[in-house]
């Protein structure tokens, strides 16, 4: 299989997650919505490129006609990528961010983990998340008040507790030495990259 672009890696991870959780692949519109494309046509172009590279197979004319070659006979994945420092503006699962893999079943976590993020700093120590820990992350774009999220703010990735009231969001540390980050969504870009679903201490 030819090497995928970082965006295509994200699409493939989303397709796999839909297959695991729902039993069927996503539509082009669902991919576009999940990845923030302006239209399903953009998703279609990525899918065609991925098919040419051998990452997926497509059934013409079928809205969910996406198949991962060999997926019916492959065993469940037993490892997760470990993501280190994330470069500004780059997708979290871009190849250059992956340090190594950890031999653990993604299904050990609920919902399933998509990757492990190496924690930097002690801003979440009061909930048992310490510098150097591996945070198991389930990729999603929505969060509810009180959840611990991986968020991207001004191209920096951070782990904090999420709270929202209208157009105001607070990213709250679990350490009294750190002040909450207050974000006005009308003025700043905030992206939820995923939810914390567990911690591995190393």
UniProtKB/Swiss-Prot annotation:
The keyword Lyase does not apply. It comes from the Bacteria. It is an enzyme of class 3 (hydrolase). InterPro entries: LexA, LexA-like, LexA/Signal_pep-like_sf, LexA_DNA-bd_dom, LexA_repressor, Peptidase_S24_LexA, Peptidase_S24_S26A/B/C, WH-like_DNA-bd_sf. It holds the Pfam family LexA_DNA_bind. Signal peptide: none annotated. The active site is at residues 123, 160. GO terms for biological process: DNA repair; DNA replication; negative regulation of DNA-templated transcription; proteolysis; SOS response. Its EC number is 3.4.21.88. GO terms for molecular function: DNA binding; serine-type endopeptidase activity. The keyword Transcription applies. Keywords: Autocatalytic cleavage, DNA damage, DNA repair, DNA replication, DNA-binding, Hydrolase, Repressor, SOS response, Transcription, Transcription regulation. Residues 28-48 bind DNA. The record marks 88-89 as: Cleavage. It catalyses: Hydrolysis of Ala-|-Gly bond in repressor LexA. Homodimer. PANTHER family: LEXA REPRESSOR (PTHR33516), LEXA REPRESSOR-RELATED (PTHR33516:SF2). Belongs to the peptidase S24 family. Represses a number of genes involved in the response to DNA damage (SOS response), including recA and lexA. In the presence of single-stranded DNA, RecA interacts with LexA causing an autocatalytic cleavage which disrupts the DNA-binding part of LexA, leading to derepression of the SOS regulon and eventually DNA repair. This is LexA repressor. It comes from Azotobacter vinelandii (strain DJ / ATCC BAA-1303). The lineage of its organism: Bacteria, Pseudomonadati, Pseudomonadota, Gammaproteobacteria, Pseudomonadales. The gene is lexA.
